[in-house]
UniProtKB/Swiss-Prot annotation:
A motif (Nuclear localization signal 1) lies at residues 137-148. Residues 574-587, 595-612 have a biased composition (Basic and acidic residues). Ubiquitously expressed. Predominant expression is found in the developing central nervous system with strongest signals in the forebrain, midbrain, and hindbrain areas and in the neural tube. Keywords: DNA-binding, Isopeptide bond, Metal-binding, Nucleus, Phosphoprotein, Repeat, Repressor, Transcription, Transcription regulation, Ubl conjugation, Zinc, Zinc-finger. This is Zinc finger protein 131. A zinc finger (C2H2-type) spans 261-283, 288-311, 328-350, 356-381, 392-414, 420-443. There is a cross-link at K598 (Glycyl lysine isopeptide (Lys-Gly) (interchain with G-Cter in SUMO)). It comes from Mus musculus.
Length: 619
């Protein structure tokens, strides 16, 4: 027992805390074990979540709600002030020069709720205010006339038991001002318009503002003599004063008054009412509860974001909020969107569409925001400096790339997106080279043959525009039609590359996507309709007429003849052996008019015409 009692007396090592803090600061500067990146005015600060949460109530609450955020952008705080607060957090040293810089750091510390930094600033202000008052009292006696209780302007103070009287200084330029009853209101308006309230500090609890205090002072001033005269003997010239229509403006300054807005629950004070109002939300007992997972949030915006992200399928959003909104569902990954613009941008990940082009290097992008970021760093653009090589740095792992394509492919590793889609076996890949390797190994496709083919319903192309076409299945060939791409092989038929605006129309999914054969897969639709059959033919009708009409007639004729050459004799003979009543009527009509048409062209045109009448036309 005696041995145990002797071991209870341990020696303390106060330097241990400083050593731990110094090592954490070294790790921050060397970017080791940092798990959060803070963006302030475009500048990135690396830090540790645990250290920030220990020094700031703001970060403590934020990291509780958002635990997986690698990047956090902070608005309303200057870069200079945040750098001082980060240095204070890791070194316990606050090195500030000037009152303006100290004021910015004070506001940032209040916003981030860093109490220790606020205490350090209060100590600094007390040390600097005492010698400052002694030095300025003797110098300003000849220039400024202080207003005492016996004069017309009465000295006022905020309602507080322990606060000292507020000293109001009136600065007047050369000359004499006579204030009469008729002109006192105009003088009050000009004085209130030019007043400068430098510091508002108060120890008591009050919701009154500085403007209310000035109004009270003005009312007591009006209770004095109706006509007063201030001679130039009472004060010296002041260059700060401005003359408006022959009347010198009197500027009132409230010096070193403490914060007006005071929280009675935690004894904190704020200069701005907005910060005070946001702070009071932390004491509110009202919370927003998720009815599905019982998670609670202090702010309504965080609650709504939680519902939209995690419980949209379960009906997390109320019926009132969903009224009038149309849900857009991606047919590739089943992701849901409320806004069609977001849905349209998401589809470009699957289609590979890049409508935004850089005018300098002609590189294309899927989003306009990405193009703007690219323009600021484009080597030949406005944002680049001469003689400097363009580099792209990853903010997550600090990897550097010379080309935008390499940087973009690298970002997929962090986001986890798989934008490259194999339409043959419905597999997704992160990198484009992975998709090309898969096509070569699994499907033996090394190169895609792309040909444009347009077929007409009738043979006289000069009089009728091309509005429909028929494609006969051929293994390993891709037919690219105007605004429509059809890929055909022995296993399936895939229709791709269609304008995504039509995907919002429910008729597309109802009338075209259902009831298709299992071996036929339709990915997109474009200004028209599609009919698929069990046989070896795929009919695509009612294509974009304006795009087809832009082609020369000679090109349309050549494409027509080229496509007819690909027809196999078996299909042609099968169509000739199985004519229907409509075919017989058409033959009699053409014989009467003396038209001579090839059998293959005629049977194919008739087949297309029958298919056109079987489906309604999408608008």
């Amino acid at each position: 027992m005696e041995a145990e009692e002797t071991m209870e007396c341990l020696q303390e090592f106060p330097e241990h805390h400083k050593m731990i803090l110094d090592r954490l600061n070294e790790q921050r500067e060397q970017d080791r074990f940092t798990d959060i990146t803070l963006i302030v005015d475009g500048h990135h600060f690396k830090a540790h979540k645990a250290v920030l949460a220990a020094c700031s109530k703001f970060f403590y609450k934020f990291f509780q709600e958002f635990t997986q955020e690698p990047l956090v952008e902070i608005e309303g705080v200057s870069k200079m002030a945040f750098r001082h607060l980060i240095e204070f957090t890791y070194t316990a040293k606050l090195m500030i020069q000037g009152e303006e810089e100290a004021n910015d750091v004070w506001k940032a510390a209040e916003f981030l709720q860093m109490l220790e930094a606020i205490k350090a600033l209060e100590v600094r202000n007390k040390e600097n205010s005492a010698p400052l008052e002694e030095n300025t009292t003797g110098k300003n006696e000849a220039k400024k006339r202080k207003i005492a209780e016996t004069s017309n302007v009465i000295t006022e103070s905020l309602p507080s038991a322990e606060s000292e009287p507020v000293e109001i200084e009136v600065e007047i330029a050369e000359g004499t001002i006579e204030v009469e009853d008729e002109g006192i209101e105009a003088l009050e308006e000009m004085a209130s318009a030019k007043q400068s309230i430098k510091y508002i500090q108060s120890t008591g609890s009050s919701d009154d503002s500085a403007l209310a205090l000035l109004a009270d002072i003005t009312s007591k001033y009006r209770q004095g003599e109706s006509k007063g005269q201030i001679s130039e003997d009472d004060c010296a010239s002041d260059p700060i004063s401005k003359q408006v229509e022959g009347i010198e403006i009197v500027e009132l300054q409230l010096s070193h008054v403490k914060d007006l807005f005071h929280c009675e629950k935690c004894n904190r004070s704020f200069k701005l009412f907005y910060h005070f109002k946001e702070h009071m939300k932390s004491h509110s007992t009202e919370s927003f509860k998720c009815e599905i997972c019982n998670k609670r949030y202090l702010r309504e915006s965080a609650w709504k974001q939680h519902l939209n992200c995690y419980h949209l399928e379960e009906g997390g959003v109320s019926k009132k909020q969903r009224t009038g909104k149309k849900i857009h569902i991606c047919q590739y990954c089943d992701k849901q969107f409320d806004h069609f613009g977001h849905f349209k941008e998401h589809l470009r990940k699957h289609t590979g569409e890049k409508p935004f082009e850089c005018s300098n290097c002609h590189e294309r992008f899927a989003r306009n925001s990405t193009l703007k970021c690219h323009l600021t760093a484009c080597q030949t653009g406005v944002g680049a400096k001469k003689g400097r090589k363009k580099l792209y740095e990853c903010q997550v792992c600090n990897s550097v790339f010379n080309s935008w394509d390499q940087f973009k492919d690298h970002l997929v590793i962090h986001t986890g997106d798989k934008p490259n889609h194999c339409t043959l076996c419905d597999l997704w890949f992160m990198q484009g080279n992975e998709l090309r390797r898969h096509l070569s190994d699994a499907h033996n496709i090394s190169e895609r043959i792309v040909t444009e083919e347009v077929l007409s319903v009738e043979t006289h192309l000069q009089t009728e525009p091309v509005t429909s076409m028929t494609i006969i299945e051929q293994v390993g060939k891709v037919h690219v039609l105007p605004l429509l791409q059809v890929q055909v092989d022995s296993a399936q038929v895939t229709v791709e590359q269609v304008h995504p605006d039509l995907l919002q129309d429910s008729q597309v999914h109802d009338s075209q996507m259902t009831g298709l054969p299992e071996q036929v897969q339709v990915s997109y639709l474009e200004v028209g309709r599609i009919q698929t059959e069990e046989g070896t033919e795929v009919h695509v009708e009612e294509l974009h007429v304006e795009r087809v009409n832009q082609m020369p007639v000679e090109v349309q004729t050549e494409l027509l003849e080229a496509d007819l050459d690909h027809m196999t004799p078996e299909i042609m003979s099968q169509e000739e052996r199985e004519p229907n009543h409509a075919d017989a009527a058409m033959e009699e009509h053409e014989d009467a008019e003396g038209l001579e048409t090839k059998p293959s062209e005629y049977s194919q045109a008739r087949k297309t015409e029958n298919d056109r009448t079987s489906l309604p036309v999408l608008e």
